[in-house]
C-alpha cells in the first residue's frame, strides 16, 4: 500500500530539515515491509521565511516529496483540505511540522489501518502543559460537548490517519467555515484512538497562540450547532417572565402603599444596563451566525495555489 504523510507548514524554516529527516527515516525503514510506496506532501500555508525554498530543495532531491504553496495564509483547515484533495496514498496521515507528533507513531497508526479502521486518531496526554492552557482546553471540551452536535474527546489532536473512504467523505463537505475536529467526528466510520505523549517543539515558535485558539473554539461551537440562538430565545422568555413578575410586584406595592409609593430609580437604571448588555451579547451571537452565512454564500475557494509539483493541482490552480 501507499501512505501519504500530510504536513502543513507556516514559517518552519528552523525545524523543517529535522522534521523531514526524522519522518523520511521512519518511512524508509518501513518501505518494502509495511509499505510499497509513500509520499510526503508539504502544504506551505503562506510562509514568509525560507520554508518554501527548503521544500523545493527537498523535492529536487527526492521525487517522493510533493508540495503545494498557497498564495497567502489560508489557515490550517484549508491546508489539510488541500492535502486530502491531492494526496495519492491509499491512506493519508496528518502530522505537525514541528515534530510534536513523533514519527515512531506512524507504524502504530498504519497497523490500526490494516486492522480495518478507517480513522485512526492520536490522543495526547496533557503532561507538561501549562495550567492556563490545560484549563482552557478542558473548559472548551466541557462547553462544546454540551452545545455541539458532535462529541469531541479531550486531547484528540490533528494527528490522524484516514482511509481513502474517509477522505472522500471529508472532502465532499463543501462548507467554507471548516472546523476539522468536528468534521472528523461528523463523518463517522470505524475509529481507533491511540494515546501518545506530545513532544516538545524542536525549534521555532508555535503559530497557534491564545487568540487563534479562542477564535478556533468559537468557530467550532458556531459551526456545529444552533443552540446559542435557542438560548437567546429561552433567555428572552425568562426575561419576559421576570418583567411580568416585577410589574406585578410594583403594582401590589402601589395598591397597598396608600399614596406613599416611590418608584425605584436605581433599580430601573440597573435593569436597563443589565438588559442592554444582554442584548448586545445576543446581537453578537446573531452576528456570528450571519457572518458565517455571508462567507458561505460567496462560494469563494478554500485556498489558491501559487506553486506546486503535483500535476492535478496545477490543472486546478487559478491562472
Regions found by a protein language model. Name each.
Residues 35-36, 120-122, 152-155, 179, ...:
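Short, hydrophobic secondary-structure boundary micro-motifs
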Residues 1-129:
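Structured catalytic core of nucleotide-sugar glycosyltransferases
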Residues 181-319:
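Hydrophobic helical membrane-anchoring modules
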Residues 57-60, 85, 111, 115, ...:
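Solvent-exposed polar/charged
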Amino acid at each position: 500500500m501507499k501512505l501519504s504523510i500530510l504536513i502543513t507548514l507556516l514559517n518552519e524554516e528552523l525545524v523543517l530539515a529535522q522534521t523531514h529527516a526524522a519522518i523520511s527515516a521512519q518511512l524508509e525503514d518501513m518501505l518494502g515491509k509495511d509499505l510499497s510506496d509513500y509520499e510526503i506532501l508539504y502544504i506551505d500555508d503562506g510562509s514568509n521565511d525560507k520554508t518554501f525554498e527548503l521544500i523545493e530543495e527537498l523535492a529536487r532531491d527526492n521525487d517522493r516529496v510533493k508540495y503545494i504553496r498557497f498564495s497567502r495564509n489560508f489557515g490550517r483547515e484549508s491546508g489539510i483540505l488541500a492535502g486530502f484533495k491531492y494526496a495519492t496514498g491509499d491512506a493519508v496521515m496528518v502530522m505537525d511540522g514541528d515534530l510534536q507528533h513523533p514519527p515512531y507513531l506512524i507504524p502504530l497508526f498504519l497497523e490500526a489501518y490494516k486492522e480495518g479502521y478507517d480513522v485512526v486518531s492520536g490522543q495526547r496526554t496533557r503532561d507538561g502543559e501549562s495550567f492556563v492552557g490545560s484549563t482552557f482546553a478542558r473548559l472548551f471540551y466541557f462547553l462544546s460537548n454540551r452545545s455541539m452536535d458532535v462529541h469531541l474527546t479531550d486531547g484528540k489532536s490533528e494527528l490522524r490517519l484516514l482511509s481513502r473512504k474517509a477522505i472522500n467523505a471529508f472532502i465532499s463537505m463543501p462548507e467554507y467555515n471548516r472546523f476539522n475536529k468536528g468534521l472528523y467526528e461528523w463523518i463517522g466510520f470505524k475509529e481507533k484512538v491511540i494515546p501518545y505523549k506530545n513532544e516538545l517543539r524542536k525549534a521555532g515558535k508555535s503559530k497557534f497562540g491564545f487568540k487563534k485558539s479562542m477564535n478556533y473554539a468559537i468557530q467550532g461551537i458556531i459551526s456545529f450547532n444552533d443552540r446559542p440562538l435557542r438560548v437567546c430565545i429561552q433567555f428572552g422568555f425568562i426575561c419576559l417572565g421576570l418583567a411580568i413578575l416585577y410589574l406585578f410586584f410594583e403594582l401590589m406595592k402601589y395598591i397597598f402603599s396608600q399614596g406613599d409609593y416611590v418608584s425605584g430609580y436605581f433599580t430601573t437604571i440597573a435593569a436597563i444596563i443589565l438588559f442592554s448588555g444582554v442584548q448586545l451579547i445576543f446581537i453578537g451571537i446573531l452576528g456570528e451566525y450571519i457572518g458565517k452565512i455571508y462567507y458561505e454564500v460567496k462560494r469563494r475557494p478554500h485556498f489558491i495555489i501559487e506553486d506546486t509539483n503535483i500535476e492535478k493541482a496545477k490543472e486546478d490552480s487559478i491562472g
